[in-house]
Amino acid sequence: TGLLPKAKNIANRRIKNANYYDKNFSKLPQITIPPRPKNFKLVYHLYIIFAENRDQLLKYCLKKGIEAKVHYPKPMYMQESVKFLKHKSGDFPTTDEHTKKIITFPCDQHLSLKEMSYVVKCVNNFYKNKI
């Protein structure tokens, strides 16, 4: 059997995982969860948040064995493919701010509740110890 018949279950599991993260990370003032469009079903291949002290959080998570990443380290308007538009650093301050804070966590359908709880626990511990 191929992947297509399983796609709905995979999507639902990823949504469930993202909802778990949303519920837990929304309790932390140092984390901002991007707005979720109404009447739109997001299927998360990445779980993206904006985090204070992102670089330190990333190092901490990696040290704890969590596959956290910065998938978008450079603002879109500064990418090589749009260089011809001649934008310069600072042209889009909101984008620049988000770029400094964006971090992703695993969200795929194979994650167990125990694994996601560990991610949440580590992020909570990081911020608890930062205060």
Question: Each PLM stretch: what is its role?
Answer:
Residues 1-131:
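PLP-dependent aminotransferase class I/II
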